[in-house]
Amino acid sequence: MAWKSIETKHYEERDAFFRGLGRVSRRSFFKLAGVSAAAALAKGLVTPQSFQLVELAWAADDGGQAKPKFTFAYISDAHLYEQKLNDRFVRAILKAVDDVNALDPQPDFVLFGGDLAQLGQPKELTLGRDILKTVKAPVKMMVGEHDWFLDMGALWQQYFGPTHYSWDHKGVHFVTIMSVVEKDFWTARGMTPMQRMQTVAGLDNGVQSRFEVGEEGRKWLSDDLAKVDKATPVVVFSHSPLYKYYRPWNFWTDDADDVQAILRPFQHVTVIHGHTHQLLTNRIGNIQFHGMLSTAWPWPYAPEGLPKLTVQMNRADPFDQFDGCGDGAVDVLENGLANALYNLWDRNPITVKASYVASDGGQDRPPTTKLPSF
Amino acid sequence: MTKTSGLALVAALVVALGGGWLARSRAEAPHHAVPPSADGNLVVGLCDGVTSAEVQGVKEGERLTRSQAQAVSDQLMEEWRRKNPQANWDDARAVHVAQAAQGGALEQSVPPPEGSRPGASIKFGGAGAAEGAREAAQTKQGGAPQGQTGGGAGGMPAGPQGPVQDGHTYGAFSQRDVDIWKAATDEFVAQGDRIFHSADLLGGTIGVSCDMCHPNAANTHPETYPKFQVQFGRVALLRDMINWCIENPVRGKPLPDDDFKLRALEAYILAQRRGVPLEYGKH
Amino acid sequence: MSRQTPRLAVLAGLIVALPFVSRADDASVPKLPLGISRTLYEVSVPKGAEPTPEKAALGDKLFNDKRLSVNDGVSCATCHDPQKGFVDHKPLAEGVAAPKERTKRNSPTVLNAMFNATQFWDGRAPSLEEQAKLPILNPIEMGQKTPDDVVAKVRKVPEYAQAFQKLNGREPTYDDIASAIAAFERTQMAGDSPFDRFIAGDEKAIDASAKRGWALFNGKGRCTNCHAFGTTSPLFSDQKFHNIGIAAHKTDFIGLARRATTIVRSGDLKQIDEVAIQSDLTELGRFLVTKQSNDIGAFKTPTLRNIAITGPYMHDGSMPTLWDVMDHYNKGGVPNPNLDGGMQRLGLTEAEIDDMVAFLATLTSDRFAAFGKHEMARQRGQKTKRPERDTDAAMGRKGNLGDLAPNPNLKNPAGIGVILPPKS
């Protein structure tokens, strides 16, 4: 079944319209966020009110250190139900697919950040898989807890392959791990698979175990990184944050300290994580952490434990299903670190730069929140 | 209940029980040897077996006046409290409701037990309560002798600050009342909890429940109502917004004002925000 | 959008502060029409800037005077006709360059314009005074080349020279002219509608269909988030900017935005005015002023008061009747990359649309009652032509344009939030 959002159909109609007028320009449909560097500089896009194009970062005279080497995009936390039950989340993921497909130039790949399904149902995973097939760039999949705990990952692995894998790309070592392993809390309680899934699906019930990478996962990571030079930039994709933010909501990785220890020897490590559905920034030692936005709904900030580097996104407006949601891109820089572009729907985009994180908030601070959640 | 009569009661109990115990094993019976006074003054021992107080100006074998006895008891109690700071002695302190989020229970003093004599009005609570108690007793027309209010086994408990007011109207509730009331309230809040977390119970048609955007009722800020609610362009109360959320993000039918579910949700949300100061109109 | 928030913060601050900061001299606040709240007046008219009768009368004359234009052919009233709801009932305004060249924007009404946080569809003018200055100098609206030309012309008219001398004790400047026009505009408050009487307690002021429409307005129609109405803030507008997808099907937003970032000089009001009125970049709306991607294609929420008599609708006048407007919203607007996330299909039936239009018709002030009836009859006559209607999209049979709630069954579906009861 061909998955085309209504927006895509309109893009096609407009394409035809302009072709008819002899004014066709493929480049016209691109979101401004994707304007390529040279073009931006050539046009002198430095007007004070223009939104922060990621590329403007290189206006600074730093010998090109902050120049992006390449970019990848992400779509995360889609939480799909079957469409006839809930069309809203489908509409949202299609919007994200349109966003990434409209980028010019196209990103090197698109990361899916986990929680493709809401309750791990076969219909949900199949729906998600079919939608993601329409993404033009290659897609890298990462598993979330909503995908796993109905059948303990059977269908996920059948569709999308192993949960732990790594690859090298343009001098950067990428690792995807599963960080939503949970110690068995269901057998003693005599839970059915659906009950287990529903327990995991609730953020605040406190019944499920805390997330962890687990011993096997950590061993896999150790072995994988053993072959990597310490100067090679490492980017880790993880669903849970790989640090300890707020335990009651499982914004938490229990063995975070151990995982961070495995990553410590490397000069430049960036962790891109999902699960938290909010703009989230942290730095622990040599590791920079960037959270991804969800397409489905935003989480409020936790009452405590918020990393001090995080500049909160504005509180979401419940009238607007897209507010507080979105997708994004990550520019991997020459120096091995990464700038995270948050493409917040219905808001101006926000870039959280590696320089901001590295300077512990001293420079390049993202715009402050007007209205925090509380 | 005054300290002296309370003390007397406890002492009597100790003797009664201790006597029985003693009867079983006279050989191991503990014996509180009060230190003798150098001047031959009366030395009174406390039931803890170690504390004692010397009464100046009263010789061994003499009777103490009421006020002297009260003063001696006070002194002994103070000494005992100093030695036992962790002791869970139920004294007649003022009732106050916990301000901070200190778990679930309302903090309570032990209210006067049943059968307390009505009309007893001894001030209690805070520093100088004992003074106040004596003052109040003094101003009474006849009635009980100074410092005495109820009596017997069912008399009012006495603490350092004095006895607790009693009565049959709401303000003189008992611990049993507190327990029942708390259970009832928590039951209601628990119902709200269930509904808050269930798209079906909310009447939602798209599988979205409140906790998806508001885990533990975060970001509901009920303490800011009434306020101008942008989503409807006018001032709103919490329940207006609950209904609006049910209609919009949750895609259910808004609940009528007298619907149990609406009230239960309100209860749950308010309960999660315990201790947060009220700040109406805050955005 | 960020430009608006300081104003909103000020507004909110003032509303909160109002119980404590009231006008010492009550005579300075004129008698307000029913439905216009004191808060709205005090927030919009700074103390000391209340119009005096002399100034307003002078402004009235200037407003209607064609000599202000370069060819003596166009006055403010040409596009903002006081007899016709202060609009011209044309889709796009036509000035001195008509018929060869029309402007690119629809004329907004002056009625209640004093209560807007900013003026123009894109909010490029911060006040009525600043707004009045721009069309006079726009090449295709009133065509004057420089402010000095205007001032010279006005000074030559003895009536004006005398009036300004009396008013200010000196010869008029361009600011004075704008100030007088603004003073006149500040007398054009319009409340006193059947809806206002209904809110004030008269159950019979509007009919059952309009009452159902009012309920839908607050519920299924999803109108109040932008077209906010409360007794303290009765403007039916949040004064923010939203992209609702008007003309999106023929607009290349991204291409236009890329051009605009290079062409438009931020802060240059005159240039932005010309770009907005004369060029195809007009469709960018608020983006021309802020250059923020969130503002691409976003236009200010207009008031709905007197909406029946201020057609055609939208920034480009592309909606001839209120039924067309309802069709546009019913299908969820026209999708485009910057469509406001609040836009979605509504699933309204024809009967519900009729009810909502009936409600909107009750927002016409009494002094225009007859004209309102006439306009509604005319629009109703065009009901069969419905180019915007897309029932399949509205009902969800095609596209992913939003989910609907089940129809509410409350006793009073409009009873959400607080409408202050009438003062007894």
Briefly describe each language-model feature range.
Chain C
Residues 2-7, 20-424:
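Periplasmic c-type cytochrome electron-transfer domains
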